[in-house]
């Protein structure tokens, strides 16, 4: 019997039989006592005289099933976090923690932590054949123990200390050790929500997303972060008051650098400790669900940071990243790109996605920087990229990974949404994989967003020359399932807030902003608005401080907030505005050619749901500060057309120029319709009308 312990003065069996120290070493060895069987316990006396009795980790057999290792090697273990990482469990009748890590190019791997003085000599792990996976069961280790892995590369001999890629909780930055997290036993209260989620037809329901950075939405009085539970209550109250259907969180996956906003992830299986423990985040999601609000998480499989204690060069070789820097480095961001062609890396990422959807009941993932994954020459100079096997610039491995990701997540978690932030014209992003598409649920409409904000930034007197920027988007509006995003990226890095991107004096800026929102909420596509935009914050977003909530003391900002609430209500209540966001039959131009007056008008139509159609909604938008009196608009139905919303209402901070609540249609054919109404179009405003029985 041989024991190695560099910190022990003496080692003995529990019955008192001593193991003599081998001279000049830290080995203790001797014959086994008669009748001793595993698992046995050893009494170790340290150099300061303290004694500790525990089971010998090396008396236990392997704890990882061969089948898990087989699936992992084939790239088909979509729940790899269930066997890799640190897992408290009972093994051979003894409680403890099973550690496992993938490091195929290491000649030695050890578990180090606060339980062994961070000494890699104490708990070396065993390798499981050719899988590259190392494991060790440490009996008696308590929950909450801090740990990392110490690895020695077989070729260079370099010794590295790395945090656990599969850690489910980490220390608060700047510390980076993983924490032994017990199995989740949170008592969820969202059974009804989860059951409905599986049955939801997301294509035809209203989806209005409030994008939030938890660290800067609100803060405590001393400027510190609020915790998940406090944020849950405050955010839900605000979202219910403003009418959004979903909250989208900028990444809360663990990350070391606050300034990355979470987009440089090091912990793909752990909610950041900045705001609390994993159960606190479960409470956050649970509280949202119990109040009818979905939760979407920004998730970053495109790249990861170079921090030397995390994924980069994990076992002394480029393991998670591609070895060729022309494929493995992102020049602009200074980060590393995942090797999507490696089975174990694909397992890692797919398991992460499923983990958030299953373990934390997340309703959807917004996949960041998809364009950078699809193109081998993305943001690269000539000669700084390697073509694929066909000589093209498409990243075939990334395409295959994204298709597999969407196929698996949609199959295992029906009703969840996987959205792509994809800024190019790559075809079929949201078409099924069996048709050759990438399989995403939805895609951000970056083209519409860019054209719209460019147009809105023009002085109204010049807008007639840029009218095509309003109408061009309809040429491709139904080629994908689009989300219309005014996101965090549009209110930072010198771009200014949405309010200050609008031209004119104070009144015109607010009127333009209200007009912009009316356009967004009546145009085909699901909606997304970044925090602060809902009340017209004037300053650019600052991730290091809370939003400027004090501006809600001023009437014009109050008016914007009321408008967003009413737009959300209108979007939810009028089926024509949401049932066919992705179907060309749900939209028709009334007039898209009124360039001289910089006005557009269109119908949103409900083609019928369960065999019964609901009334259409007509939107008229005046992009000039000139009121338009006696403006005749063609409509498809007779009767009374009620003014459902007017952004120039004094309720929102406008001049209250409008149509007295509604107008009667006349039997005057106009614009291809058999009836028409005569309207007053307020300046820099949008009006929404729909037919009904009468005033």
Swiss-Prot record:
Keywords: Carbohydrate metabolism, Glycogen biosynthesis, Glycogen metabolism, Glycosyltransferase, Transferase
EC class name: transferase
Any one GO biological process: glycogen biosynthetic process
Pathway: Glycan biosynthesis; glycogen biosynthesis
GO cellular component, one term: cytosol
Catalytic activity: Transfers a segment of a (1->4)-alpha-D-glucan chain to a primary hydroxy group in a similar glucan chain
Residues forming coiled coils: none
Role this protein plays: Catalyzes the formation of the alpha-1,6-glucosidic linkages in glycogen by scission of a 1,4-alpha-linked oligosaccharide from growing alpha-1,4-glucan chains and the subsequent attachment of the oligosaccharide to the alpha-1,6 position.
Family membership noted in the UniProt record: Belongs to the glycosyl hydrolase 13 family. GlgB subfamily.
Name listed for the protein in its UniProt record: 1,4-alpha-glucan branching enzyme GlgB
Gene that encodes it: glgB
């Amino acid at each position: 019997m041989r024991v190695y312990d560099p910190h022990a003065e003496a080692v003995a069996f529990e019955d008192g039989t001593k193991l003599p120290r081998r001279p000049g070493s830290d080995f203790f060895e001797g014959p086994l006592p008669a009748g001793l069987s595993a698992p046995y316990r050893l009494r170790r006396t340290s150099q300061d005289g303290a004694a500790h009795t525990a089971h010998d980790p090396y008396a236990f057999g392997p704890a990882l099933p061969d089948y898990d290792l087989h699936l992992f090697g084939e790239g088909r273990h979509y729940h790899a976090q269930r066997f890799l990482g640190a897992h408290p469990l009972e093994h051979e009748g003894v409680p403890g923690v099973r550690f496992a890590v993938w490091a195929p190019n290491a000649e030695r791997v050890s578990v180090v932590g606060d339980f062994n003085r961070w000494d890699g000599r104490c708990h070396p792990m065993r390798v499981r054949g050719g899988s590259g996976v190392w494991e060790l069961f440490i009996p008696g280790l308590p929950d909450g123990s801090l740990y990392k892995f110490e690895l020695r590369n077989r070729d260079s001999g370099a010794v590295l200390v790395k945090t656990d890629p599969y850690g489910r909780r980490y220390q608060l930055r700047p510390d980076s050790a993983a924490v032994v997290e017990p199995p989740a036993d949170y008592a969820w209260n969202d059974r009804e929500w989860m059951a409905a989620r599986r049955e939801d037809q997301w294509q035809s329901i209203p989806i209005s997303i409030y994008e939030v950075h938890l660290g800067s939405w609100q803060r405590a009085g001393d400027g510190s972060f609020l915790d998940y539970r406090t944020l849950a209550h405050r955010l839900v109250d605000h979202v219910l008051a403003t009418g959004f259907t979903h909250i989208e969180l900028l990444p809360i996956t663990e990350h070391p650098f606050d300034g990355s906003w979470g987009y440089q992830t090091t912990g793909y299986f752990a909610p950041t400790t900045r705001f609390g423990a994993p159960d606190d985040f479960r409470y956050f999601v649970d509280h949202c669900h119990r109040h009818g609000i979905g939760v979407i998480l920004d998730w970053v499989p495109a790249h990861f940071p170079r921090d030397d204690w995390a994924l980069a060069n994990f076992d002394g070789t480029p393991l998670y990243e591609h070895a060729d820097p022309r494929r493995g480095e992102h020049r602009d961001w200074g980060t590393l790109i995942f090797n999507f062609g490696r089975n174990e890396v694909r397992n890692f990422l797919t398991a992460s996605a499923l983990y958030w959807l299953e373990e934390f009941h997340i309703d959807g993932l917004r996949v960041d920087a998809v364009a950078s994954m699809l193109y081998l020459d993305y943001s690269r100079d000539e000669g700084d990229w390697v073509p694929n096997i066909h000589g093209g610039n498409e990243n075939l491995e990334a395409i295959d990974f994204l298709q597999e990701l969407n196929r698996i997540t949609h199959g295992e978690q029906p009703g969840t949404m996987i959205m792509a932030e994809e800024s190019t014209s790559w075809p079929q992003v949201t078409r099924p994989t069996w048709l050759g598409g990438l399989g995403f649920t939805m895609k951000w409409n970056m083209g519409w967003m860019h054209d719209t904000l460019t147009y809105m930034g023009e002085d109204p007197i010049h807008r007639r020359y840029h009218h095509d920027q309003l109408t061009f988007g309809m040429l491709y509006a139904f080629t994908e399932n689009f989300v219309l995003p005014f996101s965090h990226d549009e209110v930072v890095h010198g771009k200014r807030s949405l309010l200050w991107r609008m031209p004119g004096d104070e009144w015109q800026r607010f009127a333009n902003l209200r007009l912009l929102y009316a356009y967004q909420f009546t145009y085909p596509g699901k909606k997304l608005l970044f925090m602060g935009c809902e009340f017209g914050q004037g300053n650019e977003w600052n991730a290091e401080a809370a939003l400027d909530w004090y501006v809600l003391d001023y009437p014009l900002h109050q008016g914007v907030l009321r408008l967003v609430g009413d737009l959300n209500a209108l979007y939810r209540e009028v089926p024509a505005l949401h049932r066919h966001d992705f179907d060309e039959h749900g939209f028709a131009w009334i007039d898209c050619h009124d360039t001289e007056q910089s006005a557009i008008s269109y119908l949103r139509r409900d083609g019928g749901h369960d065999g019964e159609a609901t009334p259409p909604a007509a939107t008229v938008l005046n992009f000039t500060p000139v009121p338009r009196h006696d403006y005749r608009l063609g409509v498809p139905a007779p009767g009374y057309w009620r003014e459902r919303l007017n952004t120039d209402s004094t309720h929102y901070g406008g001049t209250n120029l409008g149509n007295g609540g509604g107008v009667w249609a006349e039997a005057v054919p106009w614009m291809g319709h058999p009836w028409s109404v005569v309207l007053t179009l307020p300046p820099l405003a949008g009006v929404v009308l729909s037919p009904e029985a009468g005033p």
